[in-house]
Swiss-Prot record:
Keyword Repressor: no
Record's catalysed reaction(s): a ubiquinone + NADH + 5 H(+)(in) = a ubiquinol + NAD(+) + 4 H(+)(out)
Name the record gives this protein: NADH-ubiquinone oxidoreductase chain 1
One Gene Ontology term from the biological process aspect of the record: aerobic respiration
Function: Core subunit of the mitochondrial membrane respiratory chain NADH dehydrogenase (Complex I) that is believed to belong to the minimal assembly required for catalysis. Complex I functions in the transfer of electrons from NADH to the respiratory chain. The immediate electron acceptor for the enzyme is believed to be ubiquinone.
EC number: 7.1.1.2
Gene: MT-ND1
Length: 318
């Protein structure tokens, strides 16, 4: 039964990821006054399947001087971690109900750094290694603010479980009292998933393609799938933390529809940002985090800690 539940989670996530690539190409197309993919199937609807077939049928070439085992493990690990992160997410019921669900997601997202680092090192290429080091520095840096923002939210809900966060938001979304945190969280998730305007790991002008420059065919497709799965996952987490739907025991499907629509809306904003903004310079990227976001989030954390103590109150769900 567990295997059936697992497949019922993995297959829709993979399908969503496939059609997100199409949605992105269509969105960018229309924002640049062109059509986007429109040949394969009606209105280009079968384009993701054509891309998948093309990539997985091609021969996976690798550099002679590369470290074979790590070269193959890195993309597999990237996709595995991207899928494992979905397990504690309530949609409205999680696959595995973990007490420390929020902490689990934060810890698992940190592991994604290893796949990027290994891929850059195992490729035995200067460009790939520089791209990987950039990605690691960026991801580790922005995880600091993500963790502090999550701490502020957990101080409001009083529990590490995601289902408690849903209960906390029965009366009002946490987006309303903590909108500065939500804005910083959203920008940090853009940086965490290496998306524009923070896609410095893939700076074509200086790094050819970034950490995946030596990858082709299937392994490259796995990195690509992991990136888009992470995007949907981060937006799903944002929807759960800041804009959770009310969960009714009688109509759990209403929660699922509401949750899906919010995730789709946030994902579309990700694509919109990519079409609208140019890439940051690397020093600006780090300046934004260490000089702007970190002091602000620390101040907000102190505020959220002091407020319940000052009012002699406790969070609602403890």
């Amino acid at each position: 039964m567990f295997m059936v539940n697992l497949l019922m989670l993995v297959i829709p996530v993979m399908l969503a990821m496939a059609f997100l690539t199409l949605l992105e190409r269509k969105t960018l197309g229309y924002m640049q006054f062109r059509k986007g993919p429109n040949v394969v199937g009606p209105n280009g609807l079968l384009q993701p399947f054509a891309d998948a077939m093309k990539l997985f049928i091609k021969e996976p070439l690798q550099p002679l001087t590369s470290s074979t085992s790590l070269y193959i493990i890195a993309p597999t690990l990237a996709l595995s971690i991207a899928l494992i992160m979905w397990t504690p997410l309530p949609i409205p019921y999680p696959l595995v109900n973990i007490n420390l669900g929020v902490l689990f997601i934060l810890a698992t997202s940190s592991l994604a750094v290893y796949s990027i680092l290994w891929s850059g090192w195992a490729s035995n290429s200067k460009y790939a290694l520089i791209g990987a080091l950039r990605a690691v520095a960026q991801t580790i840096s922005y995880e600091v603010t993500l963790a502090i923002i999550l701490l502020c939210i957990l101080l409001m809900s009083g529990s590490f479980t995601l289902s408690t966060l849903i209960k906390t938001q029965e009366h009002t979304w946490l987006l309303l009292p903590s909108w500065p945190l939500a804005m910083m969280w959203f920008i940090s998730t853009l940086a965490e998933t290496n998306r524009a305007p923070f896609d410095l790991t893939e700076g074509e002008s200086e790094l050819v393609s970034g950490f995946n420059v030596e990858y082709a065919a299937g392994p490259f497709a796995l990195f690509f799938m992991a990136e888009y799965t992470n995007i949907i996952m981060m937006n799903a987490l944002t929807a759960t933390i800041f804009m959770s739907a009310i969960h009714s025991m009688n109509f759990p499907e209403f929660f699922s529809i509401n949750f899906t629509l919010k995730t789709l809306l946030l994902t579309t904003i990700f694509l919109w940002v990519r079409a609208s903004y140019p890439r940051f310079r690397y020093d600006q990227l780090m300046h934004l985090l260490w000089k702007n976001f970190l002091p602000l989030t620390l101040a907000m954390c102190m505020w959220h800690t002091a407020l319940p103590i000052f009012l002699a109150n406790i969070p609602p769900q403890t």
